[in-house]
């Protein structure tokens, strides 16, 4: 009974309200951690999933062996692959397209690839004025991979112990 009366007076005297206001005041005058995005950039994780790229081997040959695992595992059906068989019996892609308007950047394609041919880079700032500008062909994906290969290799090496 005595405890109930004490709790009634505490609530009547608005003890909880003042506790809440004190907490709000503490954070109101604390240092802000806002980042002004276009001028300042926060560091990205090695596992960040941005724009796709196709990689090549050091001898210049493209890595994709046309196994079509990435196409099969893609939940958004954003990847289209066509392949031909070479004279030596290996398969290579003749068409490798990714529709970025469909892609949900889940990373399943990257995980499914047995030869690390398809990767997602740290490029997050890309745009298109028309819908067709976000439809990446094999040549465009290879160009992205060629341009950012040192960064891609460094991120793969940094993330290797977690795979």
Swiss-Prot record:
It is found in: Cell inner membrane. It is a peripheral membrane protein. It catalyses: a quinone + NADH + 5 H(+)(in) = a quinol + NAD(+) + 4 H(+)(out). Binds 2 [4Fe-4S] clusters per subunit. The keyword Coiled coil does not apply. [4Fe-4S] cluster 1 binds at residues 64, 67, 70, 113. [4Fe-4S] cluster 2 binds at residues 74, 103, 106, 109. Its EC number is 7.1.1.-. InterPro entries: 4Fe4S_Fe-S-bd (IPR017896), 4Fe4S_Fe_S_CS (IPR017900), NADH_quinone_OxRdtase_chainI (IPR010226). Keywords: 4Fe-4S, Cell inner membrane, Cell membrane, Iron, Iron-sulfur, Membrane, Metal-binding, NAD, Quinone, Repeat, Translocase, Ubiquinone. Its cofactor is [4Fe-4S] cluster. Coiled coil: none annotated. It comes from the Bacteria. Its main location: membrane. Residues 54-84, 94-123 form the 4Fe-4S ferredoxin-type domain. NDH-1 is composed of 14 different subunits. Subunits NuoA, H, J, K, L, M, N constitute the membrane sector of the complex. Belongs to the complex I 23 kDa subunit family. NDH-1 shuttles electrons from NADH, via FMN and iron-sulfur (Fe-S) centers, to quinones in the respiratory chain. The immediate electron acceptor for the enzyme in this species is believed to be ubiquinone. Couples the redox reaction to proton translocation (for every two electrons transferred, four hydrogen ions are translocated across the cytoplasmic membrane), and thus conserves the redox energy in a proton gradient. This is NADH-quinone oxidoreductase subunit I. It comes from Ralstonia nicotianae (strain ATCC BAA-1114 / GMI1000). The gene is nuoI.
């Amino acid at each position: 009974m005595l405890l109930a009366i004490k709790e009634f007076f505490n609530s009547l005297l608005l003890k909880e309200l003042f506790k809440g206001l004190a907490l709000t005041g503490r954070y109101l005058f604390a240092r802000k951690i806002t980042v002004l995005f276009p001028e300042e950039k926060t560091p990205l994780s090695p596992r960040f999933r941005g724009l796709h790229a196709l990689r090549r081997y050091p001898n210049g040959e493209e890595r994709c062996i046309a196994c079509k695992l990435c196409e099969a595992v893609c939940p958004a059906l954003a990847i289209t692959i066509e392949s031909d068989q070479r004279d030596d019996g290996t398969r290579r892609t003749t068409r490798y397209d990714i529709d970025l308007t469909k892609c949900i950047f889940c990373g399943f394609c990257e995980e499914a690839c047995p030869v690390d041919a398809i990767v997602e880079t740290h490029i997050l700032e890309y745009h298109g004025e028309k819908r067709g500008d976000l439809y990446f062909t094999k040549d465009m994906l290879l160009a992205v991979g060629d341009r950012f290969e040192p960064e891609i290799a460094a991120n793969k090496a940094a993330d290797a112990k977690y795979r």
